[in-house]
């Protein structure tokens, strides 16, 4: 899986270079960034010893550190986390990691126009449900749209049988995912 993702990322990078600075190059770079994010989610999950039950707080903490590092030191310093220990099965952890990655990319892209700004990521558990929140202090208004990332988030939230809520923080936006911890409970 990891080799395939690396290969796709390389091909996207080559295609982007051939397109110069047009809209196709921008789209290809965005696609490459998303493939790299999926690769990070996948590789981070399978570094652990136990791959059936995942400590989501540890997994998200490591994933956020990796993503922050890939976005640069200013972004890494701007991300704050408050992660309660929550255990989920590996399949749900991958899905949650992909949703989190997309929410971080959206905040980076829309709240701050790519410039570093504060991101707050929290994970909590209550009544057999987890709550994963990504909040920013940016310009707000970047709620679910019709683009690829929004469609992917909706699909992934559906796989979890979860709910996504958007709240205007004035300034900024808070996005909260609620989903059952154990899908059979």
Model-found features: residue ranges?
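Conserved short strand/loop->alpha-helix "switch" segment adjacent to the catalytic nucleotide/phosphoryl-transfer site
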Residues: 52-54, 71-104, 112
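Glycine-rich nucleotide-binding loop
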Residues: 118, 140, 169-176
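Short beta-strand/loop element within the Bergerat-fold HATPase_c
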Residues: 116-128
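ATP phosphate-binding glycine-rich loop and adjacent ATP-lid/helix-beta elements
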Residues: 142-169
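Short beta-to-alpha transition helix within the HATPase_c
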Residues: 29-32, 36, 40, 53-70
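Short acidic helix/loop segment immediately C-terminal to the autophosphorylated histidine
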Residues: 12-26, 49-50
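Conserved ATP-binding N-box helix of the HATPase_c
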Residues: 1-19, 90-115
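Acidic ATP/Mg2+-coordinating residue in the GHKL
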Residues: 136
């Amino acid at each position: 899986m990891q080799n395939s993702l690396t290969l796709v990322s390389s091909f996207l990078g080559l295609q982007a270079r051939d397109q110069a600075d047009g809209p196709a190059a921008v789209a290809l770079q965005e696609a490459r960034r998303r493939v790299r994010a999926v690769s990070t989610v996948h590789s981070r999950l399978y570094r652990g010893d136990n791959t059936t039950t995942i400590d989501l707080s540890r997994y998200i903490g490591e994933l956020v550190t990796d993503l922050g590092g890939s976005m640069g030191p200013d972004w890494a310093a701007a991300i704050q986390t408050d992660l309660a220990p929550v255990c989920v099965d590996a399949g749900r952890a991958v899905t949650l990691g992909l949703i989190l990655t997309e929410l971080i990319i959206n905040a980076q892209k829309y709240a701050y126009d790519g410039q570093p700004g504060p991101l707050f990521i929290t994970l909590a558990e209550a009544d057999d449900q987890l709550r994963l929140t990504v909040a920013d202090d940016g310009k707000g208004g970047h709620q679910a749209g019709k683009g690829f990332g929004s469609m992917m988030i909706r699909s992934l939230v559906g796989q979890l049988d979860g709910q996504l809520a958007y709240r205007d923080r004035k300034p900024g936006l808070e996005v909260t995912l609620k989903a059952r911890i154990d899908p059979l409970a």
